[in-house]
A protein has these predicted regions:
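Conserved GNAT-fold acetyl-CoA-binding loop/helix
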Residues: 36-58
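Acyl-donor (CoA/ACP) binding surface of acyl/acetyltransferases
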Residues: 1-26, 30-35, 70-184
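Hydrophobic residues in alpha-helical segments
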Residues: 31, 41, 63-64
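A short helix-loop-beta-strand connector motif used in the catalytic cores of GNAT acetyltransferases and
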Residues: 57-72, 81
């Protein structure tokens, strides 16, 4: 495996690229301030665009490292979501993603995720990619299923929603390198 970092990736409709601080307004307006989008995430909605800009400054600096994988999902030049490896352990990684609510249900996240999996397995050489979702967010699970991630188990009350303080069950899914190439 050879780390290659956040390279620009293209699909039929999307360009996936590293974030810059210039994305702050679009990120804030499209999802960072939206309570519905951030409900199942590990961070609360941003209160203002400066909070978003500060986060993007960190992400922009981190993206210079070859072992960091964090993409801005863009559609016709507009930043509409993000997809990242939130944990890398050797040749295994855990992904996380979110998308502007106005683009839900259009196959965009599945398209972006499929391209990232292609890159991670074919070009970088990862062995295993996993992800998880709150049981009450089945749409996220459908994205994973469409992209070949198999159900591995449910952890009971393993995630506390920041919005309500309630504990939620988490579903884990993963795809192995050999599973990925068997599907192709």
């Amino acid at each position: 495996m050879e780390h290659k970092g956040t390279k620009i990736l293209k699909t039929q409709r999307l360009v996936l690229r590293p974030f810059t601080t210039a994305d702050a307004e679009a990120m804030f307006e499209n999802w960072a301030n939206d309570k519905e989008v951030t409900k199942f995430l590990t961070w609360t909605p941003h209160r203002n665009v400066e909070e978003t800009r500060a986060l993007l400054a960190v992400w922009e600096e981190e993206s210079k490292r070859p072992d960091v994988y964090h993409w801005a999902i863009t559609l016709q030049g507009e930043v509409i979501g993000d997809l990242a490896l939130v944990a890398v352990r050797g040749e295994n990684a855990h992904t996380g993603y979110c998308l502007s609510r106005k683009f839900w249900g259009k196959g965009i996240m599945s398209e972006a995720y499929a391209e990232v999996l292609r890159y991670l397995f074919k070009e970088v050489g990862f062995h295993r990619i996993e992800s998880s979702h709150v049981v009450n967010n089945p749409a996220s699970g459908r994205v994973m299923e469409k992209c070949g991630l198999r159900y591995e188990g449910t952890m009971r009350k393993a995630f506390r929603l920041l919005s309500t303080g309630e504990w939620e069950d988490i579903v884990y899914r993963a795809v192995l390198e050999e599973d990925y190439f068997d599907r192709k």
